[in-house]
A protein has these predicted regions:
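Aromatic- and carboxylate-enriched substrate-binding clefts and catalytic-loop regions
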Residues: 28-169
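An acidic-aromatic substrate-binding cleft motif
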Residues: 1-12, 29
């Protein structure tokens, strides 16, 4: 069936309405991909948005629910399951794990990061980093219903740490 993805600042209720409209038109939708506004984007939409130490606008990478759009994420994903939808969230992980993100503390403890309060670079090429990332950052989202991830990589083409390694594999 149909996959839906659009870069738009949808709320959970707007997505429910959208799926209802598709169903009323007999559009056989199977997959709902929620673009980046599921997470906090802070000043991302400003013309002169501040950049982080990785050269990305603050809010480009994110792992903290934007509660004004998704006040009850688990409830939303439960609804998606009742609608037989597979769901994905958009990721732009170039800025690693920032200290202001909800999963930061879990991640740094699992990874063994010793520079507390400092961002942890994106190091998917490192097994220990990848394990901590999947267990403590992505895992909690999957437990509430995220089926898969849309890695929307738009930064540098190769790893800054492993020669010739594509960031999208």
């Amino acid at each position: 069936g149909y996959w839906w993805s659009r870069y738009w600042q949808y709320s959970d209720n707007e997505l429910r309405d959208l799926i209802g409209q598709m169903r009323s038109l007999d559009i056989p939708i199977d997959v709902l991909i929620v673009d980046m506004d599921w997470h906090e984007t802070w000043s991302l939409r400003r013309t002169n948005a501040q950049k982080d130490e990785y050269g990305q606008r603050i809010g480009w990478t994110g792992y903290t629910w934007k509660e004004q759009l998704f006040p009850a994420p688990a409830s939303f994903f439960e609804w998606c399951r009742t609608e037989n939808l597979k769901t994905a969230l958009n990721l732009h992980p170039a800025s690693g794990i920032q200290p202001f993100e909800e999963p930061y503390q879990r991640f740094v403890e699992a990874y063994g990061w010793t520079e507390k309060g400092k961002s942890v670079p994106f190091r998917i090429d490192e097994q220990k980093w990848a394990d901590a990332y999947f267990d403590t950052v992505l895992g909690p989202f999957e437990k509430i219903g995220v089926d898969f991830w849309w890695l929307d990589w738009q930064q540098w083409k190769q790893s800054k740490y492993t020669k010739n390694l594509s960031n999208t594999f």
